[in-house]
Regions:
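Membrane-anchoring hydrophobic helices of lipid-metabolizing enzymes
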Residues: 1-85, 98-100, 107-109, 127, ...
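Non-catalytic C-terminal accessory region of glycerolipid acyltransferases
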Residues: 2, 8, 12-13, 141-278
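Catalytic core of membrane glycerolipid acyltransferases/transacylases, capturing the structured
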Residues: 41-43, 85-138
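Short, flexible loop segments at the rims of nucleotide/cofactor-binding pockets, characterized by
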Residues: 49, 62-68, 133-139, 171-172
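Short gly/ser/thr-rich secondary-structure transition/capping motifs
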Residues: 67-73, 139-141, 223-225
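Hydrophobic beta-strand scaffold residues
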Residues: 71, 112-114, 157, 193
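Conserved beta-strand termini and adjacent loop/short-helix elements that scaffold enzyme active sites
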Residues: 74-76, 115-117, 133-134, 244-246
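Residue-level detector of flexible, active-site-proximal loop/helix-junction positions
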Residues: 78, 119-121, 137, 200-202, ...
Length: 278
């Protein structure tokens, strides 16, 4: 039984215990149970256990089917069918963004690599597709080198330049500032950049909590604890993905700084939303 516990992808009590054993001892049981429910601990662990034999594209397709999500892709003629390219995507839905993108792109390319955060790197079902930097691990330098090699490869690389799920600001759901990494790597390795727009929103609760937390000056992203709950709210929905025209690396000249080019590409991504409506 103890061995099975350590195989759980989500284990609230173990996570708290590893971070602060004293905190686990004094944390009220009702709070632990609340976190388990909001993180959908049992449901996610059960789903992963039932699908442990599925990897990468097959796993994503299975999850999309389980959630009865209809993924509609447009602009697929803009997808480079071979050669290295960096696909940059807005990040409105959290984990379902990557799953739906992989489900969509799998019909055109089987050499996809998705750059994700530390936590998702431990998801074994997608270890053939997910890549990233374990910032807190002993091999962080090695993973950084591996990521550099990835950008120089001929693979289809997907990245969320914002690094965070979109927020609602001035009644508009949009990514925060995009990081410039994809611009600098596109220039360094002469890679085409493909803008991709994913249409969707989370609940009002998520955005209100994020804004309230920000107004209080709390730096910890408390709202991230609710992303699993938001994931399950996306059952029986339609997700629209639009691939824009590829942008050659030569376009990113000296007329703008890399960070400015990143925001320019971000604007092009959101302009694709208007094309979705037409």
């Amino acid at each position: 039984m103890q061995e099975e516990e350590h195989k759980k992808f989500i284990d609230v009590e173990r996570l708290i215990g590893e971070k602060n054993p004293k905190a686990l001892k004094w944390t009220p049981r009702f709070l632990i149970n609340y976190l388990k429910r909001k993180l959908h601990q049992d449901e996610i662990n059960r789903t992963l256990a039932e699908n442990k034999h599925l990897q990468d594209y097959d796993f994503c397709n299975n999850i999309i089917d389980r959630f009865e999500i209809n993924v509609i892709s447009s602009g697929v003629e803009n997808i480079p069918l071979e050669g290295g390219a960096i696909f940059v995507v807005n990040h409105p839905l959290g984990g379902m963004d990557a799953l739906s993108i992989i489900h969509s792109i799998g019909n055109y390319r089987q050499d996809v690599k998705f750059i994700v955060n530390d936590i998702l790197l431990s998801l074994k079902n997608l270890r053939g597709i997910f890549a990233g930097i374990n910032k807190h691990g002993a091999n962080s330098k090695d993973s950084l080198h591996a990521l550099e090699e990835l950008f120089s490869s001929n693979k289809a690389i997907f990245i969320f330049p914002a690094g965070l799920v979109s927020r609602r600001i001035n009644k508009k759901v949009e990514d925060l500032e995009w990081k410039k990494t994809f611009i600098s790597r596109a220039k360094k390795y002469n890679k085409t950049v493909v803008p991709v727009h994913l249409d969707g929103e989370l609940s009002k609760f998520f955005y209100n909590l994020a804004n309230f937390r920000t107004k209080l000056g709390i730096k910890m992203n408390i709202e991230m604890l609710y992303l699993a709950d938001e994931l399950y709210k996306q059952k029986n929905t339609t997700i629209r993905i639009t691939y824009g025209e590829p942008i050659p690396a030569s376009h990113f000249n000296q007329s703008k700084k890399d960070i400015e080019w990143a925001q320019w590409v971000k604007k092009q991504v959101y302009l694709l939303k208007d094309k979705e409506k037409n």
